Amino acid sequence: MKELLYMELAEVYHRLESTTKRLEKTEILAELLRSVDKELLPDVTILMLGRVFPIWSEEELGVGIKLLMKAISLVVGVSMDEIEDEIREQGDIGLASEKLFSRKTQTTFFSQPLTVEFVYSRLKALASASGDRAQSKKINILVEVLSQAKPLEARYITRTVLEELRVGVAEGIIRDAIARAFEVDPALVERAHMLTNDLGMVAAVAREEGEPGLGRLNLEPGRPVKPMLAQLASSIESAITELGRAFCETKYDGIRVQIHRCGDEISIFTRRLENITAAVPEILEGVEEALPADDYIVEGEIIVTMDGRPASFQYILQRVRRKYDVERLTREVPLSLFLFDVLYHREPLIDEPLRHRREVLESILSEIPGRVEASRMVDVGPDNLNDALWLFEESIREGHEGIMIKDTEAPYIPGIRGKKMLKFKAEPETLDLIVVGGTYGRGKRAHLVGSYLLAARDEDSGDLVTVAHVATGLDDETLQQLSERMEKLAIERKGRKLLVRPEIILEVAYSEIVKSPEYESGYSLRFPVVKRIRDDLCLDDVDTVGRIESLFQSGQPDQPG
């Protein structure tokens, strides 16, 4: 196998970071992918996203900024305070590392140039470090890699460790680069990625097997896919008119899950593709009873009910985030599952119409009342519109969010927010935005972050662009918890203001979207209010500037949605 020096990869990162032009980025990436040996191609493709593992992998590097700073301190020979000062000045750990490494006088004797294979294998080893001395093992691995790094390499190694590459490359650009590099249909690349969630695999197949190979990639139990997403419906009547015939289902306010059975193993994934099987034993037990022992992928919503009504979303988060006291929480906060789709049963079903998929689901599901049930659904057309209106009113009366309105003839399209699936809620539409900064209060509230700077996602570059500040909707207990999290995520401070690593996602309601030069997105939210913390979402779930623009043009949220 031909070696690829990590410096060559770092120089590609630098070229990508130096241009904002999508076509130029695509060509730079295509050139790299063409030149890489087939054995390294999957790894390099994933590294281009600033990740070490596919998004659905359970493996995590488990390295926070403090641990990384300690490794840098050992390699460069400066104090933690000096590193913090440099990060504050540069506003980025990558640039700070590059500057610190450029001052390093001591070099490792007989050190060899870093290769991509070596760096990638050592970064993967971080995820395997466990036990009583896990932190020490991780530091040793980081020191081993960084002690051989040149300044530019240090910039991108440190960013990769924190999964913050900052070169303006999102999945869409990599898909285009794969298509260009190996002269295959971009639509086939997109579909293959949609079905596998693994661009490294897609790149390797495109290179070795071309379009026929891409066409053979398909859904597999055990490998989760991104969920199909819903657009806003301005009214029930307009939605039914547009679709002609639709399944209307109760919209449950819970955590959307994808449940996979492969052989004897059942795995339960959230919409951010996180495996939560161990945290929800009663759901695991329920699906073992309610579904056959065939390979399958089903989709549904987990909710908490108390006194016969849906409980707060935060109760569900409490369940899925806890790794300990699971047995006690199972008794105190019991969960229910409502299934509404099947993507695989003995064979892939996503290209089948929803009507057929629902029939399959109902044929294989043995409902367990109160534990595992099919979602409540009515088949609606222009001739029985009142059935949809009844379901909406009944769902709201019972404490649910509203209804889903789905085209009965639509295939399942992972990761796409299209017009074949609509939602209509009692409350106005909200946005899921990520916190990138904040401002501390004054006086008695000086220890609390009272205002949060929010960002949306640029779908082309993957960059985060600011869109609003929000300071209302959080009680004192939640403010305290968020402030503690912000402290741990802080990367830069200036007076009362701080910038943070983008990890906290907030669901935000607002009265209106307006154009504004104050924020990088070009838009702002009037009277934003935090509805809830969305720890069930990941960066890819953050709403895009394109969606904000679409809502602005449609004048939302004038109607409930």
From Swiss-Prot:
It comes from the Archaea. The active site is at residue 251. It catalyses: ATP + (deoxyribonucleotide)n-3'-hydroxyl + 5'-phospho-(deoxyribonucleotide)m = (deoxyribonucleotide)n+m + AMP + diphosphate. Its cofactor is Mg(2+). Its EC number is 6.5.1.1. GO terms for biological process: cell division; DNA biosynthetic process; DNA recombination; DNA repair; lagging strand elongation. ATP binds at residues 249, 256, 271, 301, 340, 417, 423. GO terms for molecular function: ATP binding; DNA binding; DNA ligase (ATP) activity; metal ion binding. It is an enzyme of class 6 (ligase). CDD domains: Adenylation_DNA_ligase_Arch_LigB, OBF_DNA_ligase_Arch_LigB. Keywords: ATP-binding, Cell cycle, Cell division, DNA damage, DNA recombination, DNA repair, DNA replication, Ligase, Magnesium, Metal-binding, Nucleotide-binding. The keyword Cell membrane does not apply. DNA ligase that seals nicks in double-stranded DNA during DNA replication, DNA recombination and DNA repair. Belongs to the ATP-dependent DNA ligase family. This is DNA ligase. It comes from Methanothermobacter thermautotrophicus (strain ATCC 29096 / DSM 1053 / JCM 10044 / NBRC 100330 / Delta H) (Methanobacterium thermoautotrophicum). The lineage of its organism: Archaea, Methanobacteriati, Methanobacteriota, Methanomada group, Methanobacteria. The gene is lig.
